[in-house]
Curated annotation (Swiss-Prot):
One of the Pfam families matching this protein, by short name: ACP
Family label: Belongs to the CitD family.
Record organism: Clostridium perfringens (strain 13 / Type A)
Keyword S-adenosyl-L-methionine: no
Cell compartment(s), UniProt: Cytoplasm
Main function: Covalent carrier of the coenzyme of citrate lyase.
Name the record gives this protein: Citrate lyase acyl carrier protein
Amino acid sequence: MEIKKPALAGTLESSDCIVSVEPSMDNTIEINLTSTVKKQFGNEIIKVAKETLKNLGVNSVVMEINDKGALNCVIEARIEAAVCRASEINEFDWGNYKCQD
């Protein structure tokens, strides 16, 4: 999926996160994380983000994640929503999408 415009998904409520994505000028994946649990779970959050981007076919993006203790499934869902919005797609074939284990 190609990121065409900036987009957001999520909230700053407890146990949620807000994810923003925008096109990368240098065709790389850049993930910036701010989290209340970064010391304990920062590496896992980054891993989930990278795997979700890979599953969506995103090869170039600047992503900001502001996490307030969200579970992995919430992080994945917020990334999916932000990427779909930024890609300006109207329909997505969820039947062929591989979710995180």
